[in-house]
Every structure is written in C-alpha cells, then in structure tokens.
Amino acid sequence: MQFSAGVNLNYFYDRAVNKEFKDIDIFLNNFQQSLYQLQHAKFPVVSCPSGLAIGGGYEVISQTSFIAAHSNSVLGLVESLVGLIPAGGGCKEMLRRWANHSDIKNDPKLLSLKVFNLIGYATTADSPIKAKAQQFLGDKDVMVMSKDRLIEEADKLIFSNKENYHPLDNASFSLPGSTVMSEMMDILNELKDKKVIGEHGIEVGKKLGYMLSGGDTNSSTRL
C-alpha cells in the first residue's frame, strides 16, 4: 500500500483542456492553505508514510511536525518528470531544510543550486536512511521497521513532544535572485543538448529556477 503518489493529474488535465483555470487555482490555493494550517497547528502532527510518498504526497508529510517513516518508504519531489513544478510548499520546504546544512555554509547561491538540482532531477530516496541524507527527513524523524508499529511510534512522538510544543516559525532564508539564473540555464541547456529535456523542459526549469532563486531579490534580503 502506498501513502500517496501525489494529486490526480487527470483532474488538472481535464480542467486545462476545458480552460477551467480558476478551478486549478482554487485547488492549489486550498492545498497550500491546508498544509500551512497543518504545519502551524498548535499541537504536534505526525505522518506515517509507507511505500510511495512522492510529489504532493511528500509535500503533505514534509509539513507535519514529525515523520515516522516505514523502512520501505520512497520519498521525493518528482513533478519535473511530468513537466510540472511542486506547488504545495515542497520548494519552500526543501529550501528550509537545506538552508542551514553544513554543505551549504549559509551560501544563498549554493542553496538555490542544490535544491534546483534536487527537484529538477526529480531526486528520490528509496529508504529513510537515504532520505535523511537528502534532507527529505530531518533529525527528529524516525524510521520504523514494521508497518504494524507505525501508529505506536507516532504516538510516542506525539506524547514525548506535546508539552511546551511550538510549531515552526514561517520559513525564512536569503536567496541570490537573478545572479544564479545563468548557472541554472547552463544546466538546462546542457540537458537539452544531450536530448534529456526538450523545449517544455527548458520552460519548466526556468520557472523552477525563478522560484528557487527568489526571483527579483538579492542575497541581502531576507525572504
């Protein structure tokens, strides 16, 4: 059984074909606001993925207080494989998770490029151990060997953290803005030359790069 492989793309395809773009906007806004409320709840929330937790499925678990992941969990943001970018907070979460990592050393350009490659290449981790290395799981998250113990481990996380619990503050980090876009375009053009991606892949990469670079900003501005 899978946790979630993300949203039903047929829903979006049908509405795009019928030019019902307002319905798409409403769906995405509701999804984003629901996950924001989940992340900022006044009590701890634990997700217990098993099997696939990718795309929108990963965006859900990434915004819970704690994750108790079964050992066979596969985690990642794979939207680029179908010509999309994560739209439920996944980009923000990966920036948050990598911002203070020792590999990044508080370098806004390194941060943007790291997450750009991670999401752009649709990187997945096929175990919780690998997921921690990619920051899909954090230090406070746990791996559970038996599915039968997922709820038990979730209960432990809740009861051991319910006293004086405080939800995460809003994500905040510095991003380089347009200064990193040329490097991102070099990556995209190389992939196009190798026939790994086509014109649409370039457009998807540009949108992803604009988002992860911070757009019209610079590294002296805290977002």
Question: Predicted regions span which residues?
Answer:
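Glycine-rich beta-to-alpha transition loops that act as phosphate-gripper elements at the mouths
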Residues: 46-54, 119-123
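Phosphate/diphosphate-binding loops
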Residues: 22-45, 55-59, 64, 106, ...
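Flexible loop/turn segments at secondary-structure boundaries
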Residues: 2-5, 33, 53-57, 76-77, ...
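CoA-thioester-processing core
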Residues: 55-109
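A structural preference for short, pocket-lining loop segments at secondary-structure junctions
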Residues: 1-22, 32-48, 70-74
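Hydrophobic/aromatic residues within transmembrane alpha-helices
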Residues: 8, 60-61, 130-131
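Intrinsically disordered, low-complexity segments enriched in small/flexible residues
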Residues: 100-123, 127, 145-223
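Long hydrophobic segments that form regular secondary structure
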Residues: 66, 119, 124-139
